[in-house]
Amino acid sequence: MSNSYVIGIAVGIAFGIMFVAFIFSYLKKKGKDICEYDERQKLAQLKGWKAAFIAAVCFDIINAAVVEARGPWSGMMVMAICSLYVGVGAYAAVCIVKDAYTPLHRRAGRYILLLLALALVNIAIGALNCQSTGLIKNGMLTMSWVNFFAAALLIGIDAVYAIDVLVKRRRAGGRDREE
């Protein structure tokens, strides 16, 4: 990985943090609270963090065993990012199932569309990266896979979200019929 690539990643992360901070400060000045969670949701989010930690640690242990037995399957950065993605996926799944993923008074539709759009952007960026670096180098996965893994994570979260919405609608429809 070249220095310009690492600098690009660092600048992108810094820009993303500044952008999110700007949006939150702007909305706070307007008096809008976009993250209104009740106590039940906050407790469920703590369970999500616990699941994320356990999932990431389990991934790291399994990954270490695979690397020890068969050799590295990718660079260290790709492995670390995959561990992060596994944790984020576990957190999202637990929070979605326990109705703690979105703030109160928000509909799931906008989040499902946003996650799908972000997945498509990651697929496009991954495809562009593949043209310049390729997918495999020296028998190991390259950084180009990170975007595809991110897209898979976002599509997985989207699928869990959509299934959760459909199950809840079906339950609500069943309750209406019983009454």
What are these regions (language model features)?
Residues 1-6, 135-149:
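Membrane-interface segments at the starts/ends of alpha-helical transmembrane spans
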Residues 16-33, 81-99, 163-169:
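Membrane-water interface of transmembrane alpha-helices
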Residues 29-44, 175-178:
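Cytosolic, membrane-interface loops and tails of multi-pass inner-membrane proteins
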Residues 42, 100-120, 173-178:
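Membrane-helix boundary/juxtamembrane motif in polytopic membrane proteins
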Residues 47-66:
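A generic, lipid-embedded transmembrane alpha helix
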Residues 57-63, 118-137:
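Hydrophobic alpha-helical transmembrane segments in multi-pass integral membrane proteins
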Residues 68-96, 149-154:
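Hydrophobic alpha-helical transmembrane segments and immediately flanking/interface helices
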Residues 68-73, 130-141:
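Membrane-interface helix termini and inter-helical loops of multi-pass transporters
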